[in-house]
Amino acid sequence: MTRTVPDRVTDVGNDLTRVAGSFLHSATTGDWTACGFCALPVDGYSLCPQCLSHRRTGLPLADRAGFLVYADEPSSQTYRMMRGYKEPRTRDTFEPIVEALLAVGLRGHFTCANKLAGTNDSGWTVVPSTRGRTVFVDLVRSLSTAPDSEIAVSHVGPKPDRVLNPASWAIAAGETLPTHVVVVDDAWVSGASAQSLAVTLKQAGVSEVSILSVARVLSPRWDENKPFVKDVLPTLSYDWTICPWTLGDCP
C-alpha cells in the first residue's frame, strides 16, 4: 500500500490479521504465472482457458478484476468460510470475517478502482444471489459509504454456468448509470456470473466496470492449481494492505 487509508480500515485490517491471518492467504503476485485477468495459476499462458473463452465471445467484458484472498476447495478453512457465512448454522462463525474482508476491500481500496478507471463518477452493485439470499448484499450495503450510488440489479434469467449470459440480469428501470461501476461478488469460480453482469452494465452504457471478489476459488480439477495449492499457497500470508486490483501496491 502506498497511500493513507482511514484509521478505522487499519484497525479492521490489523484485527482481521490477528483473528484469521492463520488461514487467510492474500491474492498476490510472485514467481509463478497467473492469468492476467483472474489470477488463476496457469502454465505459459497470458489468460486461463475460461477467461480466454469469455474474451472470444466478443462481448464487452469488465475492464479489471480484483481479489482479496484465495480459497482452495474443497476443505480449506477459507473455502468453508465462503460457504458457511451464508448458512444459518455457521453464520456467526464466518460472517464477521467476510464482513471484515469486505470492509478492507471496499473502504480501503474502492478508490483504487476509481483511479484505474480514471474517474470518480462511480457506482456499485452486487451480483444477485440466484437463490434469493440477501446475506452478501446486506453486508455490502452496510459497509457502503455511498448508498445512493447502488445500481439495483435483479436475477431474471437462467444462472450463468461458465458460459456468459447477460440476459440473466436486469438493471432496474430508471437507474441513472455512472461512468464506472464496481461489481461486488463473494467468490469467483469461473467468473461467468460477474462477467455476465459486467456485460449487462456495459451494454446499458457503462464505460468502465471493475469486479471485486472476496475470494478467488482454486479448484483441484484444474491441474495448474495443484502444485500452487501444495507448494505456494501455504507460503502466502494475509496482508490486508495488498491492493486487490494490482495484487501489489495501490495505484
Question: PLM features: what roles do these ranges have?
Answer:
Residues S122-T125, V209:
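Residue-level signal for inorganic ion chemistry
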Residues M1-L16:
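N-terminal alpha-helical interaction blocks
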Residues W124-V127, V182:
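Acidic beta-strand-to-loop metal/phosphate-binding motif
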Residues V135-A146:
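Short, aromatic/basic amphipathic alpha-helical patches
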Residues V126-F136:
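Glycine-rich phosphate-binding loops at beta-strand->alpha-helix junctions
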Residues D11, R18-H25, D31-G123, A146-L177, ...:
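Active-site-facing substrate-recognition patch
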Residues E95, F136-V137, A194-Q195:
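Conserved strand-to-helix beginnings and helix N-cap segments that scaffold or border functional pockets
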